[in-house]
């Protein structure tokens, strides 16, 4: 029997959930809801309902919340009370307290509560994490991320920290298998909006791994890069293209003493890996389905999303105070 799925929010992100839901085996998309209507024309023969209560009345087994972050808590709590498994788009909520209420509601109901950190489904990062776990880099020393793009007209309720940096916070801890211990950040609002549109952050993960994040909405091109440096080389993921490259430390001795002293390590071979490139959102949908069916547990849990929110709030706190925050 197929899982009866409903989607709340069919705007800029929700429309992609609609497309992927229709292509996911074992899932029957039966209801859509958005008070703003179907501005992207994705509903097809499905009526567009007014809100979460009507979605629940449609008899759904599972739901995806792709509404603005400010609406996540009320919608998620209503779905949990109705016994509906739910995937909430990132971030889980506007605050740690709200996120905790959501997490507790789904845990109390014995329901699957997943969160949409889609970068975990990116082929480049999946392979990067696997190679790190297998010891290809040896001891991990540093993780650096860049997430830059032009200003998105669709985002108005949060700034770059909760909309974009939340991805990098999640993927850095996930790839390294190490939680954040401290973070320091600075933010700036240059576009005239209430929320920040630029952020730089540096911190330390468990085990002494250094991490830094560069995020903004003011770059006239899209940049999605993750660099993990270890004792044996560096892995570089271009998550916009799904590419992964390994830069190995060289083994041949350098004869030019001045260069050898400056570089610290020598350059070795460069390998770009051939990866099977599926749309990450399709895999996210399959993982959510499998969790509901009890045949998989690779979805991002609400506990993990709550840990992410703690780091995100620490970033904003650090930016406001000008001081490092311990976690």
Give the ranges of each region predicted by the language model:
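Hydrophobic residues in well-ordered beta-strands that form the structural core
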Residues: 88-89, 113-115, 237
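C-terminal glycine/acidic-rich active-site capping loop/insertion
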Residues: 118, 232-303, 327
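Rossmann-like dinucleotide-binding domain that binds NAD(P)(H)
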Residues: 152-221, 227, 303
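Beta-loop-alpha module in the N-terminal Rossmann-like domain of NAD(P)-dependent dehydrogenases
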Residues: 17, 46-105
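N-terminal Rossmann-like dinucleotide-binding module
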Residues: 1-44
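A contiguous active-site-proximal alpha/beta segment in oxidoreductase catalytic domains
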Residues: 70, 93-155
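C-terminal helix-rich "cap/oligomerization" subdomain common to oxidoreductases
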Residues: 1, 62-65, 287-327
């Amino acid at each position: 029997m197929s899982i009866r799925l409903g989607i709340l929010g069919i705007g800029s992100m929700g429309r992609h959930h609609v497309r992927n839901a229709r292509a996911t085996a074992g899932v029957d998309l039966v209801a859509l809801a958005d008070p703003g209507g179907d501005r992207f024309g994705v509903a097809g023969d499905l009526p567009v309902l007014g809100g979460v209560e009507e979605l629940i009345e449609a008899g759904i087994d599972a739901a995806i919340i792709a509404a603005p972050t400010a609406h996540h808590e009320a919608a998620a709590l209503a779905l949990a009370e109705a016994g509906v498994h739910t995937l909430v788009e990132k971030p889980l909520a506007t605050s740690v307290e709200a996120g905790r209420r959501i997490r507790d509601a789904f845990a109390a109901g014995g329901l699957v509560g997943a969160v949409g950190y889609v970068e975990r489904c990116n082929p480049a990062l999946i392979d990067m994490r696997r190679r790190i776990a297998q010891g290809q880099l040896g001891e991990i020393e540093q993780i650096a991320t860049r997430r830059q793009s032009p200003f998105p007209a669709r985002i108005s309720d949060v700034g770059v920290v909760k909309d974009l940096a939340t991805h990098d916070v999640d993927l850095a801890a996930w790839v390294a298998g190490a939680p954040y211990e401290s973070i320091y950040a600075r933010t700036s609002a240059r576009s005239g909006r209430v929320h920040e549109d630029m952020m730089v952050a540096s911190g330390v993960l468990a085990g002494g791994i250094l991490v830094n994040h560069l995020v903004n909405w003011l770059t006239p091109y899209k940049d999605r890069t993750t660099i993990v440096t270890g004792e044996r080389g560096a892995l570089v993921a271009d998550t916009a293209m799904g590419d992964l490259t390994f830069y190995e430390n060289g083994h041949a001795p350098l004869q030019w003493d001045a260069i050898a002293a400056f570089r610290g390590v020598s350059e070795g071979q460069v390998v770009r890996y051939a990866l099977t490139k599926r749309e990450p959102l399709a895999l996210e949908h399959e993982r959510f389905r499998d969790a509901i069916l009890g045949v998989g547990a690779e979805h991002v849990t609400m506990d993990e999303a709550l840990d992410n929110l703690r780091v995100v709030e620490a970033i904003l706190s650090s930016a406001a105070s000008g001081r490092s925050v311990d976690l």
